[in-house]
């Protein structure tokens, strides 16, 4: 299953969120990677306990749990707090499988993650790359569920995290 989740935010809200994210400090993304995926992960991430990550994470979870398509497709019992990632020129997250069990920061609670979601804040015309590529039947197939294109800001997708996949970004700088 792979679904597109439209209009999680208005374009204006997405732009405001993006500006706030652009103005904050980012860390090495390997911080939250499991042992295997740390070998493939080369991106930046907002610290899980960063006040902006908590504020925006709560807002995203609130919007998703009010979104009829997300709720009917995902049927979540729990929603793990979102992680905020960004990619600079030449960075990527090579072939990996998302962690099946995640630990909540500052807690002993562990959450099984049966669904992964990505929400976009940057217009696709402002960067090159960013496609999700899934690995199926020992072949690199663009989108086991069909091609997953880069989405408009305030859109996202959700799907099975179990297959190997990669995310790459060629050049995140806006075109002149």
Swiss-Prot record:
Domain Fe2OG dioxygenase, chain residue ranges per copy: 78-147
One MF term in the entry's GO annotations: L-ascorbic acid binding
Needed cofactors: Fe(2+); L-ascorbate
Note on how the cofactor is bound: Binds 1 Fe(2+) ion per subunit.
GO biological process: DNA damage response; intracellular iron ion homeostasis
NCBIfam families attached to this UniProt entry: PRK05467.1-3, PRK05467.1-4
InterPro entries attached to this UniProt entry: PKHD_hydroxylase, Pro_4_hyd_alph
Keyword Oxidoreductase: yes
Enzyme nomenclature, EC number: 1.14.11.-
Protein name, UniProt field: PKHD-type hydroxylase Mfla_0096
Highest rank taxon of the organism: Bacteria
The species this protein was found in: Methylobacillus flagellatus (strain ATCC 51484 / DSM 6875 / VKM B-1610 / KT)
Alphabetical keyword list: Dioxygenase, Oxidoreductase
Disulfide pattern: none
First-level EC class: oxidoreductase
């Amino acid at each position: 299953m792979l679904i597109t989740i439209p209009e999680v935010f208005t374009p204006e809200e997405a732009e405001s969120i993006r500006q706030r994210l652009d103005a904050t400090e980012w860390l090495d993304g390997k911080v939250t990677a499991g042992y295997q995926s740390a070998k493939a992960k080369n991106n930046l991430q907002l610290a899980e306990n960063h006040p902006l990550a908590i504020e925006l994470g709560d807002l995203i979870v609130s919007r998703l749990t009010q979104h009829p398509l997300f709720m009917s497709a995902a049927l979540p019992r729990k929603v793990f707090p979102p992680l905020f990632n960004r990619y600079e020129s030449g960075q990527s997250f090579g072939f990996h499988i998302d962690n099946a069990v995640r630990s909540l920061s500052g807690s002993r609670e562990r959450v099984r993650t049966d669904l992964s979601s990505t929400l976009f804040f940057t217009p696709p015309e402002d960067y090159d790359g960013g496609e999700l590529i899934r690995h199926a039947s020992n072949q690199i197939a663009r989108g086991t569920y069909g091609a997953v294109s880069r989405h408009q800001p305030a859109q996202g997708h959700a799907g099975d995290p179990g297959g190997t996949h990669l995310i790459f970004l060629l050049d995140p700088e806006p075109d002149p």
